[in-house]
């Protein structure tokens, strides 16, 4: 069965000519609340034409976040703080070893279509994983990017990257999280993204046997982003 998001034309997400997106990497871990406040302010500035679009790569200290569809019972073991957010989706974990990319784009200037935008983010992740010979796949009923796990049994799949977005005045924020080498046991304390089927778990690049670093992923992610959304330019970090 063809995933309907696979049939969407994603070429219209390339920005206007000469419009390079700021590309920023934070080397130290960023508190989630501080990152959220920064994104809110930056998205408002982009909408007002006062700041360029931005992709911000970072790691968080261990934290659970809950989207607009999150339920209290999704947190089984409150070993870390749970922060409510306005993004779509349910409960997920962020922490060291996970590459978070917050994508702040003016979709009004690109393509004001939330469903197609999510598909474009999935495509960016799939192309990133392809650089490491990992086949990431979409699923019609599960947002994010998945890998098949025949080693675990027939029909088993693991999520390797999560997506959660929010838009204000057609400017996106929040974004994606790719599991590079996080502590996967922390996902056991939640119902990740509301998925309860025991055949569907969580994995990472290192869990799949690949000695990949965050820097490796950053390089592949930037190339994948540019192939879907257009040019980037290096941006110096700011205090969030």
UniProtKB/Swiss-Prot annotation:
Active-site residues (renumbered)? 193 (acyl-thioester intermediate)
Catalytic reaction equation(s) = octanoyl-[ACP] + L-lysyl-[protein] = N(6)-octanoyl-L-lysyl-[protein] + holo-[ACP] + H(+)
| Domain BPL/LPL catalytic residue range list | 49-233
Q: Which InterPro entries match?
A: aa-tRNA-synth_II/BPL/LPL, BPL_LPL_catalytic, Octanoyltransferase, Octanoyltransferase_CS
Its GO CC terms are: cytoplasm
List the CDD domains.
LipB
- Give the Gene Ontology MF terms in alphabetical order: lipoyl(octanoyl) transferase activity
From the record, give the cysteines joined by S-S bonds: none
Presence of the UniProt keyword Transferase in the record = yes
Q: Name one Pfam family in it.
A: LplA-B_cat
Coiled-coil annotation reads none
Describe which pathway this protein belongs to, using the record's wording: Protein modification; protein lipoylation via endogenous pathway; protein N(6)-(lipoyl)lysine from octanoyl-[acyl-carrier-protein]: step 1/2
Q: Might you give the EC number(s) for this enzyme?
A: 2.3.1.181
Protein localization: Cytoplasm
**Chain sites annotated for binding substrate:** 87-94, 162-164, 175-177
Site annotation Lowers pKa of active site Cys: residues: 159
Keyword Cell inner membrane (UniProt): no
Which keywords belong to this entry? Acyltransferase, Cytoplasm, Transferase
Instruction: Give GO terms for biological process.
Output: protein modification process
Q: Which family does it belong to?
A: Belongs to the LipB family.
Its biological purpose: Catalyzes the transfer of endogenously produced octanoic acid from octanoyl-acyl-carrier-protein onto the lipoyl domains of lipoate-dependent enzymes. Lipoyl-ACP can also act as a substrate although octanoyl-ACP is likely to be the physiological substrate.
Q: What else is known?
A: In the reaction, the free carboxyl group of octanoic acid is attached via an amide linkage to the epsilon-amino group of a specific lysine residue of lipoyl domains of lipoate-dependent enzymes.
HAMAP family attached here? Answer: LipB (MF_00013)
This chain's protein is named: Octanoyltransferase
Organism for this UniProt entry: Bradyrhizobium sp. (strain BTAi1 / ATCC BAA-1182)
The gene from which this protein is expressed is lipB
